[in-house]
Amino acid sequence: MSLDGFVAGPDQSVDNPIGVGGMRLHEWVFPLRAWNAMHGQEGGEVNESNRIVEESFANLGATIMGRNMFGGQPGGWKKGTPKKGKPWNGWWGDDPPYHHPVFVLTHHPREPLALKGGTTFNFVTDGIESALAQARRAAGKKDVAVAGGASVARQFLAAGLVDQMEINLVPILLGAGERLFDGVGADLHGLEIVSTVATPRVTHFKFANS
C-alpha cells in the first residue's frame, strides 16, 4: 500500500491490471527468494522481507480473491484474449504461485480451473460467506488468505470476517487509484498491532482484530 492509502493505481485495465504506477507497490517483493520459489525459480534476496513473505505463505491452505484479481474482463467469461486468441485463464499463467485451492468471487458461473502446481481456481457466485466456508473446508487446519483486490478485502473487513491483516507499506505516493479502506473506516475498530518490521523499501505491519 502507498503512503496515501492506495493499493492500485488509476486506470486499471486488462493490459494494466494494477493501474498506472501500481507496479511500484510491489517492486520490493520481486527480488526475494521466497517470491522466486513460489514461481518455480531459484535464487533471490534473503532478508527480513523474505522472512515475512515465507511466514505469510507457510501455513496457507486456500486463498480468496475477486474477479478482477483473477483476470479482469468484467461481464461474462470470454473465450480468449484479444491478443492471443487462447482460452482466458486469468493473469496467472499455466503454473500460478498459489499451489492450493483459490476461490474467485464472481457474478458469472464457471467450472473449476485446475492448473499446474496444485492450484485450482473455483468460481463462487453466492457471496463472501460462501467463499469463506468453501475455502475453510479446502484449507483444513491451515489458514485462509483474502488476497484482494481492494473491493473484496473491504467486504470482508466490513463484515468482520478478518482475524488478522497484513499491510506492506511502501514509501511512495500514488495520488490516485483504488484505496483499501474507502467506506469501511467506521466499521473497522479494535485492531491491535501484532508486529512492525521496517526495511528501506517497505514496512510490514501485522494487525489482529480484537
Residue ranges and their predicted role:
Residues 1-210:
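Enzymes that bind and transform nitrogen-containing heteroaromatic metabolites
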